[in-house]
Amino acid sequence: MSPAQTLYEFLSEASELTIVCHNNPDPDCLASALALGRIAAAAGIDTRQVLYSGDISHQQNRAFVNLLDIDLEPFDPAAVQNRDEGSLLAFVDHAVPGANNRVPEGTPVDIVIDHHPSEEIDAQFVDHREAVGATATILTEYVRELAIDLDTTLATALLFAIRRETLGFLRGATRAEYDAAGYLHDHADRDLLRQLSSPSVSGATVDAIATAIQNRTVRGSVLITHVGRTNERDALPQAADYLATLEGVDTAIVFGMLAEAIQISARSTDARVHIGDALHEAFADVGSAGGHREMAGGEVPLGIFADYTSDDTQLLAIVDQVITARLLAGLNLTDEPDDQSSPSATE
């Protein structure tokens, strides 16, 4: 049987489905959860819920949830533990309990559908395809093969997710993404796609991106910078996307202090660099980090710096020094910045 048929039969024997999104879910994760929920409904599961943790702070992600009216509930540990027989737990766009999610390590997972690199997947149903550009591509394949009702909301969600995850089919896109988009295109709401593609940007996000630009240092073709302390988590990937287009830059890494953690976002077009592996090597011993060859992220608890100082300015200086040093070591770079660096970042 195909993966779609195997999944459908597995779902048809269950009575309840809990879908857990990864922390701070993006459109690929959200659209995949929406599609899996529709498949579960078609398979006869009446009790379904989608849980998330972290923030949906990116303007595009907020618009995605609001305009498509996606029903989400805050993560509840009780929902994934001590489950009744016939109750299934599913991960979409992530794969391992405790890795980029709040599910306790060791929790049994029934379904995993993902395209991110991972070597520790353990579930009854696993469809793990690193070669595809988006998890939504896999779910679109299921929807198509199983003849699930493709209404405007689902088609728009899946198509936008694929476009966003592949940066308009320019990053990691395969033939599968184009095939999926061709199938979804006639069913999607074009006006809604335009609204999702051009959300408003907050002043705080612009300020954070401006700080990243000001603090940049460049070594070879690698740019490293920080946004200081911010509440705008999604300013980091937006800054990384923008700074990766700077002339002479192939890799851009942006970090910042958010609440009690250091968040890291990276983008790379350098064929010699697997930025996900580089971040994992640099931070796996103190936090969680990893991702694809071209895009990756990470999180390091601020608590490991708590013994140094309680002053935010001093703390930022220490964080900048330590995080930058680990990045330089992970990428085999020297500590001497080039002339492209911002003057204020090297004074």
Where are these regions (language model features)?
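Haloarchaeal acidic low-complexity proteome signature biased toward cell-envelope/secretome components but also
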Residues: 1-16, 78-93, 100, 111, ...
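Gly/His-enriched, cation/cofactor- and phosphate-binding structural elements
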Residues: 5, 12-17, 22, 47, ...
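Anionic-ligand anchoring segments at beta-strand to alpha-helix junctions in alpha/beta enzyme folds, i.e.
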Residues: 14-77
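Short glycine-rich anion-binding loops that position phosphate/pyrophosphate groups of nucleotides
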Residues: 24-25, 94-97, 116-118
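Divalent metal-coordination and catalytic microenvironments
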Residues: 26, 36, 65, 114, ...
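His/Asp/Glu-rich metal-coordinating catalytic cores
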Residues: 57-85, 89, 93-104
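Short alpha-helices
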Residues: 113-180
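Glycine-rich, Lys/Arg-enriched anion-binding loops that position phosphate/diphosphate groups
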Residues: 166-237, 244-251
